C-alpha cells in the first residue's frame, strides 16, 4: 500500500470510528496515508529496525535489556500514530506518548542520578510545549468545531487572521519545545545520559523531528500567517548559529551530535520559514539516516572502551583499532558537512539557496547565517573525527589492548552508510512527490536557475577553508582556542545559569511562599485539617462548658447560702479564681 501511495500520489483516508460527540462537535479517529506521512514513515521504519538490531549487541550484558526492547518498540508505535493520524487530537496522543516513552528511555539507567535528572528536565520542558498544543486544540474545537486536517484546510482561508496567528504561534511554541529550538533546548543536551541507541532513534527520525512534522502538516495554516513565518525564520536562524558555536567548543562526543541535531532541525525550520516545506521534509528524510549513523558510530567507539567515556579528549589514534567505525563516522560526517556527491549535499545546500531565492532582506540575512552555520558544521564534524581518530593516543596500553569492534553492530551501520552516501540521488523523486501535497510558494526550481553560482559554492568554500584552519590550530597553535569566547560557548551561553537564576529560583521561592500561606496557613485552619481538629475537640469543649456551668452554680449556692459573710468568703473566692485560671489555661483547653 505504501508503494501505491508513493508512486501514484493517491492519499488514503481510513475512518476507524467516532471517538466522542458533544453537540455539533464530532471527533473521529482514523489514519491518513498520504505522501507526507509515507515520506516520514520510511526513515522511521528503517532507522527503528536498524537501532533495534544495533541494540541487541549494545545492550547484551544489561540485566534489563528486555524492558529496553519493549520500550523502544512502544516508542516506534506511538511515533507511527503521530505520523499517520488524520486529526490533531489523535496526533496529540502520539505526540504525548512519544514524550512519556522518551522519559522512560532517557532514565533507563535509573541508578544514575544524572540520567534521572535529565529525564525530568526533558519531560518538564516539553510540558510547556504540550500545554500550548492542548490550548491550540481547544481553540480549534471552540472556533471550528473540528480538528481533522481536511476540515481545517477548507476553513482556514475563511478564518480571521488574528485567530490563525494565535493558533500558529501555539503550534510554533509546541514545536520549539519538542524540536529543541533556542530557548527550550536545554533538555536535548542532558538527554545524552541515556543509552546510545536511544539517542540514535530519538535524535534522528522520531521525537525531535515530530515538531517539524506537525508544522509541515499545518502548512495550510502557516501560509496564511506570514508574521509567524517571519518569527519562525529568525528563531531558526539564531538557533542554527548558536548551536553551531556551542558544538565547536564542546568536548562530549554525544553532545556535539545533539547540538548538530539542533542545528539541522533549525535548518528545517528555516526552510519552513521561507515557505519551502518540501525542502524541509526532504532534509528531515535525509538527515535521519546520517545522523542515526553518527550516533551509532559514536556508540561503537564508546562501547569499545572499558569505561565507555564520551570525552573526545581521551580518545585519539583509533583509526588503526576501529577501521570500520572510522569509515562509517567519516561518511556520516562528510554527509553532514554537505560534501558534494553525498546525501547531505542535496538536502542541505538547496535550503540555503532557497533562502537567498526569497529575495527579501530577512532571506538574505538568513542565507548568510545559514552559510555560517554550515561552516561551523564542517568545523565541528572535522574536529570530532580528528580528536577521535587522528590525534595522539590519550589512553593507556591496557585500554587499547581491549578496544574492539562488534560484528553484530556493524550490519545496521553498513545499511545506514549506504543510505548516507546514495540517498541524495533520489532527490527529484522525493521533492516532486512532496510538492504534490504541500504549498509551494517558494519553488526551489526557480531558485536553481536564477541564483548566481558564487552563492551556491560559498558554503562549500568556507567549510573547506575553515576546516583546514581548524586542523592547523589543533596541530600547531592550540592555545588560540583558549579564550573568554571559548569559555562562553563551552558553558552553552550560560543557558543553565540564566534559567536557574531568572526562572527556577524565583518560581521555587514563590512556591514556598504559596505553600506557607495556603497549605500550612489558610487550608490548615479552614480546610480539612482545621475541620477535623474542630470535630475531634467538640466533646472536650462540651465537657468543659458543662463543668464550668456546674462549678458556677455550686459556687453561687455555696457562696450565698452556706458560707457566712466573713473573711472566709473572700478567701474562698480567691482560691476559686486561681482554680479556674489553672483549668482554662491547660493545653487541652487551648485546642480549637
Swiss-Prot record:
Its main location: mitochondrion. Keywords: Electron transport, Membrane, Mitochondrion, Mitochondrion inner membrane, NAD, Respiratory chain, Translocase, Transmembrane, Transmembrane helix, Transport, Ubiquinone. The chain crosses the membrane at residues 36-56, 68-88, 89-109, 132-152, 169-189, 196-216, 229-249, 256-276, 279-299, 322-342, 364-386, 406-426, 451-471, 534-554. The keyword Electron transport applies. Disulfide bonds: none annotated. It catalyses: a ubiquinone + NADH + 5 H(+)(in) = a ubiquinol + NAD(+) + 4 H(+)(out). GO terms for cellular component: mitochondrial inner membrane. One of its GO terms (molecular function) is NADH dehydrogenase (ubiquinone) activity. It holds the Pfam family Proton_antipo_N. Signal peptide: none annotated. The keyword ATP-binding does not apply. It is a multi-pass membrane protein. Its EC number is 7.1.1.2. GO terms for biological process: ATP synthesis coupled electron transport; electron transport coupled proton transport. InterPro entries: NADHpl_OxRdtase_5_subgr, ND/Mrp_TM, NU5C-like, Proton_antipo_N. It is found in: Mitochondrion inner membrane. Belongs to the complex I subunit 5 family. Core subunit of the mitochondrial membrane respiratory chain NADH dehydrogenase (Complex I) that is believed to belong to the minimal assembly required for catalysis. Complex I functions in the transfer of electrons from NADH to the respiratory chain. The immediate electron acceptor for the enzyme is believed to be ubiquinone. This is NADH-ubiquinone oxidoreductase chain 5. It comes from Debaryomyces hansenii (strain ATCC 36239 / CBS 767 / BCRC 21394 / JCM 1990 / NBRC 0083 / IGC 2968) (Yeast).
